[in-house]
Amino acid sequence: MGFSLGAMMGLVRSYRRAQNEVSLCLARRERIQETAFSLDSFSSEDCLSLFRFLPHHIVKLVSLLHLVVPFPRSRLAVDPVECFCVVLRRLASPCRWYDMEELFGRHAPALCVIFYATLEVLMHRWDPLLSEWRVDFLRERAALYSTRIEEAGAYLDKCVGFIDGTTIFVSRPGRGFQRACYSGHKRRHAIKFQCVITPDGLIAHLFGPWEGRRHDMTLYHESGLDAVLSDALVIQGVQHYIYGDAAYLVRPWLQASFRGVMTPNEEACNETMKVPRSAVEWGFKDVKQVCASLDFPRKLKIREGPVGLFYRAGALIWNLRCCAYGSATADFFKCPPPSWEVYLGSLLGLGGQGAAAGSTSKEESGPSGAGGAGEDGDEAGGA
C-alpha cells in the first residue's frame, strides 16, 4: 500500500514537532538541574527587587515567623527560607510558574505546591495580625498616633487612624458571581476590603474579601469593628476615634467628613483632614506596589485561586516590610513603625512592654519609603 505525498509530509512534520518538544524538555531539565537556590547568590539590590527584602532580613523574618512548612502528600524537602522566597517572588510580580523555574531550580508543579503550602501555614498563624484589633498594642501607641496626626495639621486631636474601603479588580468571573462582583461605581468586576491604617504606615485591621458591589458602610457593619471600637478606643477615660470619608456614619469612635451644607468651621475641618486622611490611600498603593501581582486582574480569577487570601498575604508582607524600611505614611507623620519583635509579639501577648517606646527607625541598610523596592521593571507575565 503506497502513501500519498501529503501523508508523507504530515508524518515528517509530526516527527520534527516531537523532536523539538523532546529537545525543549531536555534543555529545560538541564537548566533546572544546574540551579540550586541560595540567597547568598543574590546581591542586595537583586534581592530587594525580586523578594522585597534584604537577604539577612529574609533569614531573620523566617526565624521570627517560626515558619515550618510540612509537605505530607509529597516527597519535597524544602528549606523554610526558600519556601518564604517562593511566596515573596510569586506575589511581588505577576510572573508565571515557568518564569520562576530557573530562579529556584524546581519544576512548576513543585513551585505551585510550595507556594500554596507556605501561604496556608503563614496566614493560619499570622492572619490575626490583620483580622483582630490588638487592644493592648494599639492602646499603648494611641498617644503617639494622635499626637503625630495632630502635628501633621489635622483639626481633630484624638484621631488614631484612618478607615476606608479598597477595590481589587479581578478577572471576569463565571456564572453566579458576575452580578455579586460587579461594581457599578467602578464599572468593573472586583472584590472589596476594608482597611484601618495607622500613622506609622501599618494596616492595623483588614476585613474582607467581600463582594465588589457592597458599600463601605456595609463592610463596616459586617466586620464587627463597631462593637470592638466602642470599648477599645476609650483610653484612660478619654474617647479616641478613627476617621473616614463621608460614606461612614458618625459615632463617638468613628468620625467622618462633614457633608451637605456646611458652616465655615466644618469646611475648615474637612480641609485640614483631607491630606492626613489620604494616608489610607497611600497604604492601598503601597500594598499593590510591593506585591504587584495584586494589580494584575488577569491573574486574579475567582474560583481558580484564593484571591482574597493573596491580598491578605500581601498586606501582611507590606506590614513586615514597613517595620523594617518605613513608608511614605510614616515619613509624612514622622511616626516610626515598631520593630518586628514588637509587631509580631503584639499577637502573642508580648508586645505590651515598650510597644510605644520600642519603635525603631528605618534600617540603615534598607531603602527609604515605600518605593524603595516597588519598581523592579517586571513585565506582566501571561496567565
PLM region spans:
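Short, amphipathic alpha-helical "recognition" segments used to contact nucleic acids or chromatin
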Residues: P80-S93
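Structural recognition of short helix-loop-helix hairpins that underlie histone-fold modules
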Residues: V59-A77, P94-C95, C291-D295
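Short, flexible loop/turn motifs enriched in small residues
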Residues: P55, P80-V81, R187-I191
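Charged, often Cys/His-bearing segments associated with DNA-binding zinc-finger transcription factors
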Residues: M1-P72, H124-D127, G326-S327, D331-P336, ...
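Amphipathic, well-ordered alpha-helical segments in soluble domains
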Residues: H57-L64, R89, R96, I114, ...
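Short alpha-helical segments in extracytoplasmic peptidoglycan/chitin-binding modules
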Residues: L54, V86, M100
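Alpha-helix N-cap/helix-initiation sites
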Residues: R75-P80, A108, C112
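Short, well-ordered secondary-structure "scaffold" segments embedded in the functional core
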Residues: R96-A383
